[in-house]
């Protein structure tokens, strides 16, 4: 995980700063990222029960659109052919903490931060989509529920997280480029 972040950080640095960061600045970026990530993650973990409730409810609402017989009780979504339990790991708090840490460390002003918050909300709803997709698949194929949880769950996360991160970085790059042009 750390080496992946280092590679991504250097990709970010090379792509968006033309390789102008010193080794000290790179290390400082990573230290800030990890500290902010841990703080945000622990805050989200502290509110884990509430977050589970919110994620379960929103997942249920969207699942109900495609599976009208779905029922909700606590953090369980009861489907006609299966039951899905939403636990703390399903909330996306790890993903949200990482994305928020990147945004806090990388943003240079409030506009960039607000753009980043949009991507955090998008990540939150991508996670809801992931749970709804799992509900749909495990209801259609109850005998393979674990397989669909793994494939759909990780497939969505591993596909859309890089898209969100790269999308955020590209938008910030365009914003910074247009801001620099207007100052010339």
UniProtKB/Swiss-Prot annotation:
Q: What is its main location?
A: membrane
What subcellular locations does the record give?
A: Cell membrane
GO molecular function term, any single one? peptidase activity
Per UniProt, which keywords does this protein have?
Cell membrane, Hydrolase, Membrane, Protease, Transmembrane, Transmembrane helix
Q: What class does this enzyme belong to in the EC scheme?
A: hydrolase
* Entry EC no(s): 3.4.22.-
Q: What are the GO BP annotations of this UniProt entry?
A: proteolysis
Name the residues that span the membrane.
27-47, 86-106, 114-134, 151-171
Name any GO cellular component annotation: plasma membrane
Q: How does it sit in the membrane?
A: Multi-pass membrane protein
Family matches, as InterPro entries: Archaeo_ArtE, Exo/Archaeosortase_dom, Exosortase
Where does the source fall among the domains of life?
Archaea
The catalytic residues are 90, 130
> In this entry, which stretches build a coiled coil?
none
NCBIfam families annotated for this entry? Answer: archaeo_artE, exo_archaeo
Q: What does this protein do?
A: Transpeptidase that recognizes and modifies its substrate by proteolytic cleavage of a sorting signal. Following cleavage, a covalent intermediate is formed via a thioester bond between the archaeosortase and its substrate, which is then transferred and covalently attached to the cell membrane.
Q: What family does the entry list? A: Belongs to the exosortase/archaeosortase family. Archaeosortase E subfamily.
From the Swiss-Prot or TrEMBL record, give the protein name. Answer: Probable archaeosortase E
Q: Which organism is it from?
A: Methanocaldococcus jannaschii (strain ATCC 43067 / DSM 2661 / JAL-1 / JCM 10045 / NBRC 100440) (Methanococcus jannaschii)
What lineage does UniProt assign to this protein's organism? Archaea, Methanobacteriati, Methanobacteriota, Methanomada group, Methanococci
């Amino acid at each position: 995980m750390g080496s992946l972040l280092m590679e991504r950080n250097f990709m970010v640095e090379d792509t968006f700063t033309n390789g102008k960061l010193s080794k000290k600045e790179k290390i400082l970026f990573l230290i800030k990222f990890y500290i902010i990530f841990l703080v945000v993650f622990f805050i989200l973990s502290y509110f884990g029960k509430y977050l589970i409730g919110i994620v379960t409810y929103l997942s249920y609402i969207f699942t109900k659109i495609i599976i009208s017989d779905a029922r909700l009780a606590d953090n369980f979504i009861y489907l006609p052919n299966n039951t899905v339990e939403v636990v703390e790991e399903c909330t996306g708090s790890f993903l949200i903490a990482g994305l928020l840490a990147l945004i806090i460390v990388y943003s240079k002003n409030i506009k960039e931060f607000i753009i980043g918050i949009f991507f955090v909300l998008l990540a939150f709803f991508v996670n809801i989509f992931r749970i709804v997709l799992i509900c749909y698949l495990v209801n259609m194929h109850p005998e393979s529920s674990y397989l669909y949880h793994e494939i759909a769950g990780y497939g969505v996360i591993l596909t859309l997280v890089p898209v969100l991160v790269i999308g955020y970085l590209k938008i910030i790059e365009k914003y910074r480029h247009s801001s620099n042009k207007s100052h010339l």
